[in-house]
Each structure stands twice: as C-alpha cells, then as structure tokens.
Amino acid sequence: MNIGSFVTNEKETYGIFFDDYAQSVTDNFIREYRNLREVIERKSTPLMYENALSTPKLKHNKIKFLPPIVNPTKIICIGMNYHKPYPVDGKSLSNPENIILFGKNSEALLAHNEILEIPAGDASDSFDYEGEIAVVIGTQARNVSVSNADDFIFGFSAFNDGSVRDWQSHSIYAGKNFSGSGSWGPWITPLEDLTDLRDLELTVFLNGEVVQKATSNDMIFSIQEQISYISSIMTLNPGDVIATGSPDGTGASFNPKRFLKAGDDLEIQVSNVGSLKNYI
C-alpha cells in the first residue's frame, strides 16, 4: 500500500495512496504522529493503514501532492552509478572504484505534478534531468553489512536529481541544489510490496519520448552496497532518502544537448512503484 504526504482543504496531512485516490489519516492520528517520518520511525504503518482506511476517498486531482516525506534528515545522492559518459563534458570514463556521494537539500526538491523552477540567468542554459530510483530508510542503520542491508529499507520512490551542468562542472553541490530544480514522489511503495529489488525498472520520458531506461540490476554498486557504504560513514535514520544514481540518456548526453526548457513535460517511472510527473 503506497504512502505519502499531501494537502487537502488547505491542510497538510499524510496517508495512503491508490491508483486514483488517497485517504488521509485523522486529526487524532496526526496529534500522535506529527508526520510520516515519525510513523516510519515508530514502526506504525499498520496503525496508519487502519486509520486512513476509515476516512473519505480523495481523488488525486482534488489534492496537492507533497514530497512523500516532507522533513527527511538526509538526502544522499549517488554519482556515476551506471556506465555512461560523464554528463558535464561527455568524456567516457571507466567505472568508479568507490561509491561517489553528494548531498541534496530538501529545498531543491518539489513534489509530483509541480512545475520545476527554471534557474535564473545563465544557469537556465544547462538545466538537466536525471531520473533515479530512490530508497527510503526504515530502520536506523550504522555499519550495516551488504547481506543485511535489505532489513533497513522501508520502501522506494521515483526521483529527479535536477542538475545545472555548467555549475556542476565547478561545484557538484552548487549544480545539484538549485531551489525547486528536482523532485521526488509521487509516494513511497513499501519494500514488502515488491518482489525483486534487482529488477526494478527505471524509465524516463521527456515530452512522451523515452530518454532513459535501465534496471536496478544495471547499477555499478547495488542498493545494498550503497546502504552498507553510507552507514559505514554516518548513521542513516528512518525517513532518510538515497537517490541511487542515473543511467545514460540525460539531456547532456545528446548531441545537440537536450536541456530542459519551458513547456517540457517530464515523467520518471519506476516499475511497481509509480510515476513522478513534473512540468517545466
């Protein structure tokens, strides 16, 4: 059962999602669990399901989607995790020997159905998309082994690591953190609802055309290896998000380049999870 956050009747809430409707938890439930991160942290999703199923059904077009977790403590992105040319200069590189990490601010990420913010000035000339599979942590993780990493996963979502390539060439952090340049959602699909983490399919559509396509099995470093490595450096907390890398097919990989422009439609689809749609 998919879970996420949204606004209804001008009130921020969270709950469960189905194909064409959502159901919010009650006000009493929110007084006990202020946000979805607390529900995950306290292992209370069964209680949340029971509570939300008792409330009215809300059509998707009657709510405003929010990022599934509105207050993650960390958003960690993985760089160069599929074999492809480096997106800034197009050079073909050998696979990295070690996992590459960088951070993303919550302010850089919008929700499903929102309009991405085109960076001002020259930064708009190299505004790019990167479709990714996102992992949401369910249990605090520190020094986790690869073999046990699945035990710390709560679920999965779709992610757009919006990037300004000209800025990325001199500062990864700057190029990856323009306000409103990326997104994630539309919801989180729990691990228990998925059968094979090695075969999650990622497909990205730009104006209806497939531009990126890969599976989780194509990753250089597996999801489990990523969790193990990150947890050897820092503590991963419930609700933390890991964006697991983007395959070839970003705008910078085309000749001529196909950077995002006003009027574009972007859709990032993860099989058995959902489709994240945004507009430019």
Walk through the language-model features, giving the residues of each:
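A generic local secondary-structure boundary/capping motif
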Residues: G4, F65-P67, V88-S92, L116-F127, ...
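Catalytic-pocket segment enriched in acidic/His residues
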Residues: T8-E10, Y49, L53-L58, P85, ...
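Flexible glycine-rich active-site/ligand-binding loops centered on an Asp-His dyad
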Residues: P96-E97, L101-N105, N148-S179, N217-S222
